Regions:
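Phosphate-handling active-site elements
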Residues: 171-172, 197-211
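Charged C-terminal helix
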Residues: 205-247
Length: 247
């Protein structure tokens, strides 16, 4: 990777966008930080998906050293897409994350959403972000704590999946009905669609709504196909729809 970066630097390479996701260790994170230092320009869109854990637990790759580097990456980004576990890890570290995550699970409906909004606002402010998008929030109540982009909530008490967006001080939610179980790779797809839209200078609201609709279709297809959760989701069928979208 270093030789490739050296060659790109000679050629004056300047990407429109940089998107980082899963990093296995501190060494990989250091390489990405070096990449950002060398190639990020004033107008480069930087999106970081700080993959470190889920469902209130850190992944096996997690170390305090990796967290420190994720913090550096997040400080270099305009937009981040953590799940709730990762948002708490960025703010508080592993031990405090576990306590706070457990506390959030004890809250119902609206109260839980309100606390997550505060977490999103704190994250955006502390890291000086254009937007913090906290993904994969399960929700069952009918009312919402902030304006929602997608109002597919006609069926009372049906399970919804929500994504919180805190953008330049504004707070809103994007909900869609939950279909099936938990599938590998959905966070990667969400962040990929989001980053591509932002590079095309679409609004954050448009990008998030687009990513949620795309994932909803892909997950529904996956459930119908009976695909194992570890094999990811059947998204290929819907790529054409993304290609047809204009700015």
């Amino acid at each position: 990777m270093e030789q490739i970066m050296d060659e790109w630097e000679k050629r004056g390479f300047s990407p429109d966008g940089i998107y980082t996701g899963f990093l296995a260790d501190e060494e990989q994170a250091d390489k990405i930080l070096d990449f950002l230092r060398r190639f990020r320009k004033e107008k480069t869109v930087v999106l970081v998906d700080p993959v470190m854990g889920d469902n209130g637990g850190a992944y096996g790759i997690y170390t305090e050293g990796l967290r420190e580097r994720m913090v550096q990456l997040v400080r270099s980004a305009q937009v981040i897409t953590p799940n709730l576990t990762e948002a708490l890890l960025l703010l508080y570290g592993k031990e405090e994350m576990e306590k706070r995550y457990t506390g959030l699970l004890e809250l119902d409906g609206e109260k839980r959403l309100e606390q997550i909004e505060k977490i999103g606002e704190k994250l955006a402010n502390e890291y000086c972000l254009q937007a913090a998008v906290i993904t994969g929030i399960e929700y069952v109540k009918e009312q919402k704590a902030a304006p929602a982009l997608i109002s597919d909530r006609n069926e009372k008490n049906s399970m919804q999946m929500g994504n919180l967006v805190v953008e330049n001080g504004q707070v809103y939610w994007c909900f869609a009905p939950k279909t099936g179980g938990s599938y590998s790779g959905t966070g990667d797809l969400f962040a990929s669609v989001l980053s591509a839209g932002l590079v095309k200078r679409m609004s954050m609201m448009t990008c998030v709504e687009l990513a949620v609709k795309f994932l909803s279709k892909a997950i529904a297809e996956t459930v119908q196909e009976g695909t194992d959760r570890n094999d990811g989701v059947c998204f290929e069928k819907y790529l054409e729809e993304l290609c047809k979208i204009e700015k």
